[in-house]
Amino acid sequence: MFFERPEAGRRAVLLHVNFKGPAPGEALDTVEECAELALTAGVDITQTLSATRIAPHPRFFIGEGKLREIEACLQAADADLLLVNNELSAGQQRNLEQALHCRVMTRTELILHIFADRARTYEGKLQVELAQLKHAQTRLVRGWTHLDRQKGGIGLRGAGETQLEMDQRMLGERVKTLQKKLVSVARRRGQGRKRRRRDRVRVVSLVGYTNAGKSSIFNALTAAGVVAEDQLFATLDPTMRQLPIPGIGEVVLTDTVGFISHLPHSLVEAFKATLEEVANADLLLHVVDASAPDVEARIRTVNEVLEEIGASDLPTIMLYNKIDALPVGTEAQFDVGNASMPVSARTGQGLDVLLEAVASRLGVTAPTEVLLPPEAGRTRAWLYRLGAVLSERVQEDGSLALMVQADQDLLSRLSMQPKVLLQGRGRDPRIPALPGDLP
């Protein structure tokens, strides 16, 4: 009842209300984005209506004149769903349904439906169900209005009150069960992070607005074959793959769910275990659709979510994707060294430079000469396996002189090995200097 999903092909009228001043539930994103969400959910938008108000109508959210207009549009289009690109109170939603004799769905409920449809893993399904239940708890009263009118005598409670309390208790118990299961999921993820820290494995996370091309970049870098479709929330469940970075070796690259303006808070809370992977990353790759009309607004939305999950202060590289869709020559505005760069997941443009930037931001130092004794063959092989060796020469005494480019952690581990010497450091002009680099 509370998780009713719109069937594929269901016809709907889309309503967006603009407000002249601040108002609860004001929708700041575009109508086109909400229509794209509807398309993703399989809903056919037959007509889009808009209204402008100073504040929401306390009963219907909109005025009665607009209410009659919507009713006529629903009848003319043979539609049985009103999709509202704003947030409604439980009472406003109930009153609209009673007045229009149709299902009314808010933007939040539409996003919850899409997430429920896309969740594939055990963890993802748990998180979506928890978000749905949290939302349902705020809407529960409207499901039992036909029983609320039944009154009890002195010392007795009406049937509606009893049924409502029973349903609230059932939802509350299920929420507690899901939260306990997700605590176990978070514990397992935490153990995985501890293992990676113990093994000194770096984590790089892709973040960004939904449909910015995160999964396409993930596939281009790792050949993982993750589903990458031109639609909102094509990726929901997080994916991890190893990515070789010169001088560091294998890092873990994670592909995460995309963000969107006014992402329901219940979803952010429910996906806490997943989003903690982002908050615990060593480096973020913030993917931006450079061809989008509202680039700055989308960047702000992503930054707001990152701040909410405690990841706003992490080192970040801005990746302006889909640069091939822009006029030739415009990519220069996005090229700001290791902090920002133009890329194209489709053509591969800029991905080689990206790997160098990742190495630099993760702390790869300037080239260092390492002297290995003849018997250190395993150490030599290990350095080659990490992709850290730039050049090699054999000394007269049989020792090996390797020009190595690696992070400080790897160099420290080398310096602690017997008979291994770290000599003066030269600079590779291909790698930008880092703060603290020796000349």
Could you say what each language-model-derived stretch is?
Residues V31-T40, E71-A76, E87-C102, P246-E250, ...:
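Conserved C-terminal guanine-recognition region of P-loop GTPase G domains, centered on the G4
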Residues L14-N18, T48-A51, L83-N85, H286-D289, ...:
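Conserved beta-strand segments of the P-loop GTPase G domain that flank and frequently precede/overlap
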Residues M1-L112, L422-P439:
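N-terminal accessory targeting/assembly segments
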Residues M1-L14, K134, T138-A212, F218-N219, ...:
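C-terminal-of-GTPase-core extension/linker across diverse P-loop GTPases
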Residues R189, R196-R202, A220-V251, I260-A270, ...:
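Switch I (effector-binding) loop of TRAFAC-class P-loop GTPase G-domains
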Residues N18-P22, R53-A55, E87-A90, E109-L112, ...:
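Conserved nucleotide-binding/hydrolysis micro-motifs of P-loop NTPases
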Residues E109-V128:
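Short alpha-helix plus adjacent loop in nuclease-associated cores
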Residues F2-E4, A27-E32, A55-A72, D237-P238, ...:
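Switch II of P-loop NTPase G domains
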